A protein has these predicted regions:
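N-terminal core-binding DNA-recognition domain of tyrosine recombinases/integrases
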Residues: 10-101, 112-128, 133-211, 226
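Catalytic-site neighborhood detector that most strongly recognizes the C-terminal catalytic loop/helix
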Residues: 214, 272, 371, 375-396
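Basic, Lys/Arg- and aromatic-enriched nucleic-acid-binding interface segment
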Residues: 222-250
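Conserved tyrosine-mediated DNA breakage-rejoining catalytic core shared by Y-recombinases
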Residues: 246, 255-289
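Short, polar N-cap/turn motifs at the start of nucleic acid-interacting alpha helices
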Residues: 260-263, 319, 332, 342, ...
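C-terminal catalytic core of Y-nucleophile DNA break-rejoin enzymes
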Residues: 275-292, 306-328
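Short, basic (Lys/Arg/His-rich) helix/loop patches that form interaction surfaces
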Residues: 281, 325-369
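C-terminal secondary-structure termini that scaffold catalytic or DNA-interacting sites
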Residues: 398-410
Length: 410
């Protein structure tokens, strides 16, 4: 393994960390790890993965190995690509990950074509394309492991073994099957015979949707009480106010620009990441005040035009993971959603706003516009939690005989 580049330029990495405000202890860990790598320089090393595995072999301290993995990964990115570390992102090793990289050329070609096909037919959400590509890759890898080098050589047992265990119990979800089907349908244009054959073998699974969890009035009260204290930073208060009063997606919060806020017209304008459609939201007083306080008092001075910036150097726009972390922190401080299985995420605020609008008899197209949906049918899942109107649909059973002690009828 050639460590010449690292040996000649590692001081640039150290100087960058000093100039970016990294702590002395953090810089020391990097310098220590670089020194150990350069001093050892074992002939058996062919990659940074080998370097890490060497330290795994001589240490059983999991805490020590955890920081070594992060540091060695960052050193690799610097050595190979000249990229400096970002302390808000844990670097892993530069190595092919996922089933796709283990597929033969035939299956890789199908996945590649699906991605092109998905964009062509107007699938705009990258996460959907990535998710379906991943499901298809894992499915193809399973077939490949069973000796099926292409779809034409695949039999029904090969396909069903992916979805069912040896006892015939279902081990894959309907959503997984739907994703695999999407990849195969796209592949009809590349391998019509093989894809059509495997499509016929796919099981017909019914997708069962669970009722959407929602924030209770008591939980909302606790969140509002927390917002009235000085426990949260102005940035976090502004983010929670946006989630609570606009139902905006977390990914759209991080993409908000300073110019997105029209203070004169009291509106927020943005292009949604999911639908690529323009959305205009009213700038409510509580939201506007929280944003103004953050921007004028706490927001770091930097060259970025994103509204929300990291609180520590190196300053940069927030990532969506940070929004999720803020929500988790707020729920913890408010002492809500602490039980196992409780849903925690930004979508809870979106659900809450939708249900409240439904309770006020707001028309579905209006709700869809507020939430930025492309179709009014997107609101349908929320109707299952509109208990206010569902109660009106309940039929009285007072005319039917009920055994005493089952329940009381007032």
């Amino acid at each position: 393994m050639d460590l010449t580049n690292l040996r000649q330029h590692h001081e640039e990495l150290v100087n960058h960390m000093k100039n970016s405000g990294y702590s002395t202890s953090c810089i020391y860990m990097y310098k220590r790890q670089i020194r150990e790598i350069l001093d050892l320089d074992l002939e058996s090393w062919t990659s940074y993965q080998d370097i890490y595995q060497y330290f795994v072999s001589i240490s059983s301290n999991q805490k020590d190995l955890k920081w070594r993995r992060s540091v060695i990964g960052s050193i690799e990115y610097f050595d190979i690509y000249g990229l400096f570390p970002d302390r808000r992102r844990i670097c892993s090793f530069i190595e092919p990950r996922g089933a796709y990289h283990s597929l033969n050329h035939v299956y890789q070609q199908l996945i590649d074509y699906y991605k092109t096909y998905a964009e062509r037919i107007g699938k705009t959400k990258d996460t959907t394309i990535d998710s379906e590509s991943h499901s298809g890759s894992v499915f193809f890898y399973h077939l490949q492991q069973r000796g099926c080098c292409n779809l034409e050589s695949t039999e029904e047992d090969d396909v069903l073994s992916y979805f069912l265990d040896e006892s015939g119990n279902l081990i894959r979800s309907a959503a997984c099957c739907k994703s695999v089907r999407a990849v195969l349908k796209a592949g009809l244009e590349v391998d019509p015979i093989g894809c059509k054959k495997v499509l016929l073998f796919l099981p017909h699974l019914t997708e069962h949707r669970k009722n959407i969890q929602m924030l209770t009035d008591d939980e909302i009260c606790k969140i509002n009480q927390l917002l009235d204290t000085d426990t949260l930073s102005l940035r976090d208060k502004a983010i929670i106010n946006l989630l609570l009063h606009t139902g905006i997606r977390g990914v759209d919060i991080i993409n908000l620009k300073l110019q997105s806020i029209d203070w004169n017209s009291d509106v927020i304008r943005l292009i949604q990441s999911k639908t690529k459609k323009e959305l205009e939201l009213p700038l409510l007083p509580s939201v506007g005040n929280a944003l103004y306080d953050y921007i004028t008092i706490e927001r770091p001075k930097c060259s970025f035009d994103a509204v929300f910036i990291s609180a520590v150097v190196p300053y940069e726009p927030l990532k969506v993971q940070t929004i999720r972390w803020i929500v988790r922190k707020v729920f913890g401080l408010a002492n809500i959603r602490m039980n196992k299985g409780d849903r925690i995420g930004t979508h809870l605020f979106r659900h809450h706003l939708t249900v409240k609008l439904l309770e006020k008899d707001t028309a579905l197209p209006v709700i869809s516009n507020i939430l930025g949906h492309t179709s009014p049918k997107s609101v349908d899942p929320y109707l299952h939690t509109d208990f206010h109107h569902l109660k009106e649909c309940a039929l009285s059973i007072e005319s039917y005989p009920v055994r005493k002690g089952v329940f009381d009828i007032d």
